[in-house]
Amino acid sequence: MHNESPIIRRKSTRIYVGKVPIGDGAPITVQSMTNTKTTDVAATVAQIKALERVGVDIVRVSVPTMDAAEAFKLIKQQSNVPLVADIHFDYRIALKVAEYGVDCLRINPGNIGSEERIRSVVDCARHHNIPIRIGINGGSLEKDIQEKYGEPTPEALLESAMRHVDILDRLNFDQFKVSVKASDVYLAVNSYRLLAKQINNPLHLGITEAGGARSGSVKSAIGLGLLLSEGIGDTLRISLAADPVEEVKVGFDILKSLRIRSRGINFIACPTCSRQEFDVIGTVNALEQRLEDLITPMDVSIIGCVVNGPGEALVSTIGVTGARNHSGFYEDGVRQRERFDNEKMIDQLEAKIRAKASMLDANNRIVINMLEEK
């Protein structure tokens, strides 16, 4: 029930990764990357399926060898989401996966050899209508740039990015996006700010090698939150030393918190104190797990007492305000006659949320059908 995001997004060109639009006002996409051995087709496909279940838009797969390229062919055949092939050094791998239907190539043109080889890859991408991501990383800058700046700086990452952009510009290829990732939040943020002023191509956001699930999520939320709040960014990946499924969840949570793109339940819950009339923490934890399958955007407030509960419920799709034995229930900001038994709160609230989601989905389908009929 909250208003749309006030963020004005940076204007950028449009590319397509498979059928997924990126840039030019398209919804900001959430990506992840497999961490299985690509040659283990079954394990890689299983991980992609798990990512699909939590709503991933695009998945990147490392393709370091020709054997991995052959495996990629089989993986692609069994995947429903667009796949990006991550390739370094050997340009022939890029040519091979292009034959196998890759949706995007993640390369740095400067590290795959001579201009003739670069031209071969770009011509192949052009022929198959495959976009390219230029992926600059603070940990792998070119030797001459490292010597020039002494250490990774925003200016160093920008120079590296523009060097690769210029290569594609000279080859008259404009179907690309760019990233300038670093593990340091300030370095990454300031690098993206500089790059956003130089080009109008879509930008892929990320804090690279951010850390474990907790610390990496915090770094990513701060870094990407700063950029997204300034309108910078067209697609993102949360880089965690954790299950890739967690990357997708955190990515959507960041977009949801800025009201940029909502997917599933936005829980509003108090940290609890001695005034709570039911087990708020247990209720929230249980419902987050039970309702992971819902994709309908909804605000659900779960507040343990009447101090802030009614106010939060007024701006929530579903709201609960704690009271002794039986807690107050709100729907669309209106208090209902029905009350929840505090001992059966979880089951009752889950049922109400699912029923509301079904109703909202049905209403949306009616609106879509009416628009299509026009």
UniProtKB/Swiss-Prot annotation:
Cofactor note: Binds 1 [4Fe-4S] cluster.
Catalyzed reactions: (2E)-4-hydroxy-3-methylbut-2-enyl diphosphate + oxidized [flavodoxin] + H2O + 2 H(+) = 2-C-methyl-D-erythritol 2,4-cyclic diphosphate + reduced [flavodoxin]
Binding locations of [4Fe-4S] cluster: 270, 273, 305, 312
Gene Ontology molecular functions: 4 iron, 4 sulfur cluster binding; 4-hydroxy-3-methylbut-2-en-1-yl diphosphate synthase activity (ferredoxin); 4-hydroxy-3-methylbut-2-enyl-diphosphate synthase activity (flavodoxin); iron ion binding
Pathway stated in the Swiss-Prot or TrEMBL entry: Isoprenoid biosynthesis; isopentenyl diphosphate biosynthesis via DXP pathway; isopentenyl diphosphate from 1-deoxy-D-xylulose 5-phosphate: step 5/6
Metal-binding keyword on record: yes
EC number: 1.17.7.3
InterPro entries membership: Dihydropteroate_synth-like_sf, IspG_bac, IspG_bac-typ, NO2/SO3_Rdtase_4Fe4S_sf
Swiss-Prot/TrEMBL GO biological process terms: isopentenyl diphosphate biosynthetic process, methylerythritol 4-phosphate pathway; terpenoid biosynthetic process
Co-factor(s): [4Fe-4S] cluster
Keywords, alphabetical: 4Fe-4S, Iron, Iron-sulfur, Isoprene biosynthesis, Metal-binding, Oxidoreductase
Record-linked NCBIfam families: ispG_gcpE, PRK00366.1
Family: Belongs to the IspG family.
PANTHER family reported for this sequence: 4-HYDROXY-3-METHYLBUT-2-EN-1-YL DIPHOSPHATE SYNTHASE, 4-HYDROXY-3-METHYLBUT-2-EN-1-YL DIPHOSPHATE SYNTHASE (FERREDOXIN), CHLOROPLASTIC
Protein's job: Converts 2C-methyl-D-erythritol 2,4-cyclodiphosphate (ME-2,4cPP) into 1-hydroxy-2-methyl-2-(E)-butenyl 4-diphosphate.
This protein's name: 4-hydroxy-3-methylbut-2-en-1-yl diphosphate synthase (flavodoxin)
Source organism: Yersinia enterocolitica serotype O:8 / biotype 1B (strain NCTC 13174 / 8081)
